[in-house]
Amino acid sequence: MQPNPDLVRAIANRYAANLRLCLPLRRTSLQLARAVHGNIITFGFQPRAHILNRLIDVYCKSSELNYARQLFDEISEPDKIARTTMVSGYCASGDITLARGVFEKAPVCMRDTVMYNAMITGFSHNNDGYSAINLFCKMKHEGFKPDNFTFASVLAGLALVADDEKQCVQFHAAALKSGAGYITSVSNALVSVYSKCASSPSLLHSARKVFDEILEKDERSWTTMMTGYVKNGYFDLGEELLEGMDDNMKLVAYNAMISGYVNRGFYQEALEMVRRMVSSGIELDEFTYPSVIRACATAGLLQLGKQVHAYVLRREDFSFHFDNSLVSLYYKCGKFDEARAIFEKMPAKDLVSWNALLSGYVSSGHIGEAKLIFKEMKEKNILSWMIMISGLAENGFGEEGLKLFSCMKREGFEPCDYAFSGAIKSCAVLGAYCNGQQYHAQLLKIGFDSSLSAGNALITMYAKCGVVEEARQVFRTMPCLDSVSWNALIAALGQHGHGAEAVDVYEEMLKKGIRPDRITLLTVLTACSHAGLVDQGRKYFDSMETVYRIPPGADHYARLIDLLCRSGKFSDAESVIESLPFKPTAEIWEALLSGCRVHGNMELGIIAADKLFGLIPEHDGTYMLLSNMHAATGQWEEVARVRKLMRDRGVKKEVACSWIEMETQVHTFLVDDTSHPEAEAVYIYLQDLGKEMRRLGYVPDTSFVLHDVESDGHKEDMLTTHSEKIAVAFGLMKLPPGTTIRIFKNLRTCGDCHNFFRFLSWVVQRDIILRDRKRFHHFRNGECSCGNFW
């Protein structure tokens, strides 16, 4: 019997009416949709496409994608609305692979601009800019006309991967040609593209030009331009823009400025901006307070952070929570119990909370606890792995970082460019040049060669592996540079003794309009110190406050003192210490002690050492430097006194360790090491080298033997077994003639070993690179890049 058409129509209308009541994100809506769906199945009703499409839409917007897909698969020939809805649903949930699968199965004749827009938007929102651009090009090739939404979406993807100004201009021209270029949403996206690729002031100028031409600016227009200024360090222009804004839009702009100041390390400026907000009568909101907490956390302002926390708790009209920011505040201020207590009291601990906890332990150097947290986490995402891998590397656990990176891949996580950056940092810690090259090759193969984070990590890795030319090459070929890129190259050149070139790069950076931050100034001061560029170093130090409004920290003052001591200006160094705006820290006294050791200034050196004994009595380096000074002048009673002081205080000298990498295998040597299978052959080879070097004038400096041994022969034997000498002899035996030898040591190399390496490079006619705790030494033809000051 044929069903009554009127009855069918009535049932269909009732279902449609019920589904129209379903609103996204309401639990009752999902329940109603399920009831309708169940009723359809129970009574065997065959609904038309518009009802099925509405059901799929409700399921997708309620994040019930399994139900949506089940219903979608039951449709013999889904129409373009159903396909587009599924694409949007998968993209919103971050499952780009399934979204792409639905899109690619749609016949070209069924696709339209809306379906392309959904897929392009999905790529952009899920940080796959290249795929967004490629699909945009394919869309045009297949004859589909992009609309305003298409351009806004693809430009969001372009902002992620823009290589250069030419690419930005090409898309800008295409938008103008289509008539979409003056639409506010598209113009906002163009401002974002130019700002995010602002490797030069001209691009930021282009962003401002687009902004000025927007006829109907909305809140996003102002905040996008503001964010562009802030992220590129142009806070003065940001403040000018702020003054021209309507009062009802200033809250978001203030938030952007505050967040930008915090991200760039200008914490006092961020807090001053908060004060201005309050005095202007602008209410702080849920976006302001987390930035304030971050500023307090990074600046160590625990009491202010607690006051903000207490204030928010008293505000009944605040329904938001920022427990994750509070966890960071207490961790960074060393209050681990309070941080853990906040975490434990969280009513719902999501993955973000766990990652915040993990990051807190990692950033505070508590790697043991971080490992336990990581193991405890029932769910992990790629960010969890990134935090742990980078944390291991940054805390000196390079080998564990590489193992965890391999484990991550075995667990089925595809490494992103940030994960690769963590692995590359691990290679930098170990000096694992061959491994680093392999990761570089993988990055190129996968298509991450334009990644900013990976590029910056590669510069540092090659520099720390002693291959500064490859660090230069990575920098030159990076499509986009930020201040971290410039900092990495300046640091690389400074570490390797290319101080003048480091200064040239810094000046080039300034000419390009890139504003230095506190790290930039620290690296250029270090470069000046290593190269003995006293006048330039002092000029750059003075510019910190006078030009860039960056108050120097203890680390900057330490570099200045090191610079002055290098040139023997001890009275100037003392004057700097006396005029410090804070109590001298350990690193400042250590810089003074190091300079005294090199120049033999015993009186001032003893003062510096006494200060260090008071600040860090457990640090073995102070005792060793002071012992070296006394030993150099034959004061063996004083050497014995310092050694006894170490024993009485329970201070143990860190074991010296040197290593060399050969074909991804690392060979490690300790002092007096006989554990290596080829140890006997290495010592015989060392003796032969010593004879040849003595013939050419090398005399072992026995003042670096920190024991009162009567026999010079015995003293010389003790010097022969230093770990870096064993490592370099092994390298000379095993590596082909002409190969550069790269040795890494965990402590500062002694004066005799330094002299030994100078003569050795002349005898064997090879370049030898030694990385010790302080810097790099490039030995060639009997000379060292450090100029015998380290």
From Swiss-Prot:
Q: Give me the ranges of the annotated region Type E motif.
A: 588-663
Q: Which Pfam families match?
A: DYW_deaminase, E_motif, PPR, PPR_2
- Which domain of life does the protein's organism represent? Eukaryota
UniProt cross-references to Gene3D superfamilies, sorted A to Z = Tetratricopeptide repeat domain
| First and last residues of every PPR repeat | 48-82, 84-109, 112-146, 147-182, 183-217, 218-248, 250-284, 285-315, 319-349, 350-384, 385-415, 416-450, 451-481, 482-516, 517-551, 553-583
Keywords from UniProt, A to Z, are: Repeat
For biological process, the GO terms are: RNA modification
Q: Which InterPro entries match?
A: DYW_dom (IPR032867), E_motif (IPR046848), Pentatricopeptide_rpt (IPR002885), PPR_At4g14850-like_plant (IPR046960), TPR-like_helical_dom_sf (IPR011990)
Q: Which region is the signal sequence?
A: none
Please report any disulfide bonds recorded for this protein chain, giving both cysteine positions. none
Annotated stretches, region: Type E(+) motif: 664-694
Q: Where is this region: Type DYW motif?
A: 695-790
Q: What one GO molecular function would you report for this record?
A: RNA binding
**PANTHER family, per database record:** DYW DOMAIN-CONTAINING PROTEIN, PENTATRICOPEPTIDE REPEAT-CONTAINING PROTEIN
> Which NCBIfam families does the entry mention?
PPR
The record's comment on protein family reads: Belongs to the PPR family. PCMP-H subfamily.
Question: Which protein, by its recorded name, is this?
Answer: Pentatricopeptide repeat-containing protein At1g25360
